[in-house]
From Swiss-Prot:
GO molecular function: acetaldehyde dehydrogenase (acetylating) activity; NAD binding
A GO biological process held by the record: catabolic process
Keyword Membrane (UniProt): no
InterPro entries referenced in this protein's UniProt entry, alphabetically: Acetaldehyde_dehydrogenase, Acetylaldehyde_DH_C, NAD(P)-bd_dom_sf, Semialdehyde_DH_NAD-bd
Protein name: Acetaldehyde dehydrogenase
Enzyme class: oxidoreductase
Family membership noted in the UniProt record: Belongs to the acetaldehyde dehydrogenase family.
Keywords for the protein's UniProt record, in alphabetical order: Aromatic hydrocarbons catabolism, NAD, Oxidoreductase
Binding-site residues, NAD(+): 10-13, 160-168, 271
Residues annotated as catalytic: 129
EC assignment: 1.2.1.10
Gene3D superfamilies: Dihydrodipicolinate Reductase, domain 2 (3.30.360.10), NAD(P)-binding Rossmann-like Domain (3.40.50.720)
Catalysed reactions listed for this entry: acetaldehyde + NAD(+) + CoA = acetyl-CoA + NADH + H(+)
Length: 300
């Protein structure tokens, strides 16, 4: 039986996430929560058979138990996530946070998803689009040899940056920098985001620079990065290396691009697509652990 889910936020990310959850073998999107009764996201959700409310999380709370909602995705804003999380936690709902609020531990699926399941976290943070794209590369390098400093530059199309993204720019840089260190393994991390107004819009591009201790092991680092890219491609097929890794002294540079699947968002919105795909991937693994727990025979 599929695990019932609610999506909080009916904007670009929430609507694209709904499309991905509808394909999931273990997740069932049951609710879409918004605040604008006329939003396109709520209209699409109703057409897809989901229950909807435009009264925010408060409109969902009375129905959580009756509809068996076990997992909620918060695709709203860092500024309201704390309150949403408090209300959902009181109802025993697992929260996947797609905002930069970072109340719970970071989750970058190919790097530390198993750790998050093992530590019993009830709120996990999906970092940022830049974090999901670049932290795996930093981690791949640091698995080979220590990284003293890592700097990432995420360039996204202005068209793919909605009001939520623009409002959370400062949180984006802080949260991504922390994830580079805490998940990627760099001693010091820095993140930069660039909104590119070019027309036609360009797909997401990311640059990852790592300064390693000692002379870089070219072969081992290249193989580690290639393995990590293959892991990300399992849930983001449009994730690929554009150039690199290249080596200049102790600096290792990798140039990436991320093309979206085009579920609800245009193909150039790879920055949003990698967030929804990573969140769906994480939730599927959590759902499987919930199913395993419920299927396990009771012991005296």
């Amino acid at each position: 039986m599929k695990i019932q889910c609610a999506i909080i936020g009916s904007g670009n990310i929430g609507t694209d996430l709904m499309a991905k959850l509808q394909r999931s073998p273990v997740l069932e999107p049951a609710w879409m929560v918004g605040i604008d009764p006329d939003s396109d996201g709520l209209a699409r959700a109703r057409a897809a058979g989901l229950k909807t409310t435009h009264e925010g999380v408060d409109g969902l709370l009375p129905h959580i138990e009756g509809d068996g909602v076990r997992i909620a995705f918060d695709a709203t804003s860092a500024y309201v996530h704390a309150e949403n999380d408090r209300k959902l936690q009181e109802k025993g709902v697992m929260v996947i946070d797609l905002t930069p609020a970072a109340i719970g531990p970071f989750c970058v699926p190919p790097v530390n998803l198993k750790d998050r399941i093992g530590d019993g976290a009830t709120n996990v943070n999906m970092v940022t689009c830049g974090g999901q794209a670049t932290v795996p590369i930093v981690a791949a390098v640091s698995q080979v040899q220590p990284v003293d400093y890592a700097e990432i530059v995420a360039t996204i199309s202005s068209r793919s940056a909605g009001p939520g993204t623009r409002k959370n720019i400062d949180e984006f840089t802080r949260t991504t920098s922390r994830a580079i260190e805490q998940v990627g393994g760099a001693k010091q991390g820095k993140a930069i985001i660039i909104l590119n107004p070019a027309e036609p819009p360009l797909i997401m591009r990311d640059t990852v620079h790592c300064l390693v201790q000692g002379k870089p092991d070219h072969k081992a680092i290249t193989e580690s990065i290639e393995r990590m890219v293959a892991e990300v491609q399992r849930y983001v097929p449009g994730y690929r290396i554009k150039n690199g890794p290249t080596f200049d002294g102790q600096r290792v540079s990798t140039f990436l691009e991320v093309e979206g699947l085009g579920d609800y968002l245009p193909h150039y919105s790879g920055n949003l697509d990698i967030m929804t795909a990573a969140a769906a991937r994480a939730a599927e693994i959590f759902a499987e652990s919930l199913q395993s727990a419920s299927d396990a025979p009771a012991t005296a």
